[in-house]
UniProtKB/Swiss-Prot annotation:
Record-stated family: Belongs to the universal ribosomal protein uS5 family.
InterPro entries: Ribosomal_Su5_D2-typ_SF, Ribosomal_uS5, Ribosomal_uS5_bac-type, Ribosomal_uS5_C, Ribosomal_uS5_N, Ribosomal_uS5_N_CS, Ribsml_uS5_D2-typ_fold_subgr
GO cellular component, one term: small ribosomal subunit
Gene this chain is encoded by: rpsE
Bias-annotated ranges (Basic and acidic residues): 16-26
Purpose: With S4 and S12 plays an important role in translational accuracy.
Native source organism of the sequence: Salinispora tropica (strain ATCC BAA-916 / DSM 44818 / JCM 13857 / NBRC 105044 / CNB-440)
Residues annotated as domain S5 DRBM: 37-100
Keyword field contains Protease: no
Keywords, comma-separated and alphabetical: Ribonucleoprotein, Ribosomal protein, RNA-binding, rRNA-binding
Source organism superkingdom: Bacteria
Protein name: Small ribosomal subunit protein uS5
A GO MF term: rRNA binding
Region ranges (Disordered): 1-34
Any one Gene Ontology BP term: translation
Length: 204
């Protein structure tokens, strides 16, 4: 009987350890890895592939990743389980990082981006306005560190098209220095004084 009690106690200890592992690692076996990046899952879809024995299901995840300070990227992951699809999407997004020109927490000028049937218009906004945007656009802008902006979706309502149109708009932004260099003019001649003053305040 004492031996049986020891075996029962050992089993309880192992079960407790398994519970601790589940708490630490969520649904997986490994602990959750902390990351300095912001991650937003925009869409998760289930995909069915018809094979000889029936149908095989998998999941796709559209993920936005950014550092909240002017860097952002998008990734598309596919796997048999949702967490694995998201993880693949995150890694794919990190491979497509690009820098976004900003003035304070807004954008330097109005811009329109298009991708497939998606069309997104972005306009600068004064400090404290916030992100006036729908879900997919908001996810991209927040991950990019843009917190004062006006937006409008003019095309498709498909989240994938909207996300890629938003990224196309951000890639179309130019800093005042880039515009001045392209035109061969001083920065003061191509950028409003209020914009330069706002940027100087942020830098200080």
């Amino acid at each position: 009987m004492p031996g049986q009690q020891r075996r029962g106690g050992g089993s309880g200890g192992n079960e407790g350890g398994r519970r601790d592992n589940r708490r630490e690692g969520g649904r997986g076996n490994a602990p959750v890895e902390k990351t300095p990046h912001l991650e937003r899952v925009v869409a998760i879809n289930r995909v069915a592939k018809v094979v000889k024995g029936g149908r095989r299901f998998s999941f796709t995840a559209l993920v936005i990743v950014g550092d909240g300070d002017g860097t952002v990227g998008v990734g598309y992951g596919k796997a048999k389980e949702v967490p694995a699809a998201i993880a693949k999407g995150v890694e794919e997004a990190k491979k497509h990082f690009f820098k976004v020109p900003r003035i304070g927490q807004s954008i330097p000028h109005p811009v329109q981006g298009e991708d497939a049937a998606g069309v997104v218009l972005l306009k600068p906004a004064s400090a404290g306005t916030g992100v006036i945007a729908g879900g997919p656009v908001r996810a991209v802008l927040e991950c990019a560190g843009i917190h004062d902006v006006l937006s409008k979706s003019l095309g498709s309502s498909n989240p994938i098209n909207i996300v890629h149109a938003t990224l196309a708009a951000l890639k179309g932004l130019e800093s005042p220095e880039a515009v001045a260099a392209r035109r061969g003019l001083p920065v003061e001649d191509v950028a409003p004084a209020a914009m330069l003053a706002s940027r100087a305040e942020v830098a200080s």
